Amino acid sequence: LVYRDIQKTKNNVIIKNDLPFEKSDYEEKIFTHPTMLFRYSAITFNGHRIHYDYPYSTEEEGYKDLVFHGPLQATLMLRAAEKYKKAKAYFFSHRGVAPVYANDNLFINIENNENGNLNCFTSTKDAGMTMKGEAKF
């Protein structure tokens, strides 16, 4: 969870993060559909309205759209890493660096690293890198 100061603003500034590597060994594209966010909120008992209540998310919290779940983003990244490696990871770490919003394309990028494990990151066109991680096999 990320707690922010209460502020009502229409001036959403997007800071574009640099991507950690130019070309991925593997990439998936996921559309961040609002229904996916609602369902994930339901199955994880997450009642935070920024994930499913558009007027609340945009008018009260000042986001540009519904906010995509960080844990869902991490789960999708781990799933893509295991699919690419065709094995189950014994360790996975991740860190969110920028928000992802509904109604956008989320790119999941996987790259082999020198230790035989995988570097992972997610990105959007507007924000650049949104989450980074490593899967160990």
Question: What role is predicted for each listed range?
Answer:
Residues 2-68:
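Catalytic strand-loop segment that frames the active site of acyl-thioester-processing enzymes
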Residues 1-32, 100, 107-137:
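HotDog/MaoC-like acyl-thioester-processing domains
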Residues 45, 82, 115:
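Residue-level marker of positions within ordered structural domains that often coincide
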Residues 54, 62, 90, 95, ...:
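A residue-level detector for conformationally permissive "hinge/kink" positions
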Residues 36, 77, 129-131:
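Detector for methionine-enriched segments
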Residues 63, 69-109:
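Hydrophobic beta-strand-centered segment that forms part of the acyl-chain substrate-binding groove
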Residues 20-22, 30, 57, 82-86, ...:
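Homeobox/homeodomain signature
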